[in-house]
Amino acid sequence: MSAWNKLKLLILISTTVSLAFAASNSSMPLISESGTTYQTKFAQLESSVNGRLGIMAINTANNQQLEYRGNELFPFCSTGKVMVVGAILKASESNPQLMLRQLHYSKQDTESSGYAPISGQHIKDGMSVSALSQAAIAYSDNGAMNQLLQLLGGPQAVTSYARSMGDDKFNFVRTEPQLNTAIPGDERDTTTPVAMALSLQKLSLGTALDKKQQTQLQEWLKANTTGDKRIRAGVPKGWIVGDKTGTGSYGTTNDVAVIWPPQAKPIVLVVYFTQNKKDAKPNDQVIAQATKIVIDEFTTASKK
């Protein structure tokens, strides 16, 4: 081999190694100032609570993303109500009168749903689609969600709506309260943290909904009454949070949120947590702690 050919070979090898290193380095987890990766922090948190933790966070200011078990399936429980109401709002774009439509239901409908703090008070007069949507998001009213599901055509219609947004993981099969069984390995009524975060971003901040409908969804999320001890408990004082919680068997504890830091673009965050024992207690603190890790990482990165 001539000297020139040897030189070209050396250059090729050097370039290949450099590119390989760059490619591997680009997917390496971010390192915090303490030298600990955020995945390590999540793993330590997960091991301390004897469960499985799934996280996806998107900083829309720079598209920085943090994920942990982001592509694993988790039971979504009542966080799925975001997708149901998203489908309702989408339908209202072409049918503005839809939100004013009055739906009537029975006492049996509310009682069988397992939780109907708002819809249960309106059995005689019924509720508008708008009021039912608000109840489903802000109060996690199962009776309200079941009425919205029936109006849409059932859980499969919501799954189809998710597919129309490019979400191929969201799998809605059952109604309330059956969808909250959260049995390990059961793929019914599950999604991944990554898929849910991307769908939530499209619904609340992107182009999946027209501006009027998107603003309404944001307002309902901000008015949520069930999340004070979860993601909201993990953000600094003065930050605005719009979220939807979910709780189920096996200690399943979920929260999905859009977070608005002061004078900064929003953060989309999904935190899912589930355990191995059917009668395990929900754990709000793990959601708050995971949120703090995310905020610390994003804050540190923005200062560099």
Regions found by a protein language model. Name each.
Residues M1-I11:
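Bacterial N-terminal signal peptides that target proteins for export
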Residues L10-A20:
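Bacterial N-terminal signal peptides
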Residues K90-T110, P155, T159, D210-Q213:
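Short, well-structured active-site flanking segments
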Residues T110-Q147, P155:
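Conserved catalytic neighborhood of penicillin-recognizing serine enzymes
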Residues A23-P75:
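Beta-lactamase-like hydrolase cores
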Residues N63, P75-Y105, L269:
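Active-site SXXK
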Residues R52, N146-L200, S204-L205:
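Mid-domain, small-residue-enriched loop/turn segments at the edges of structured enzyme/sensor domains
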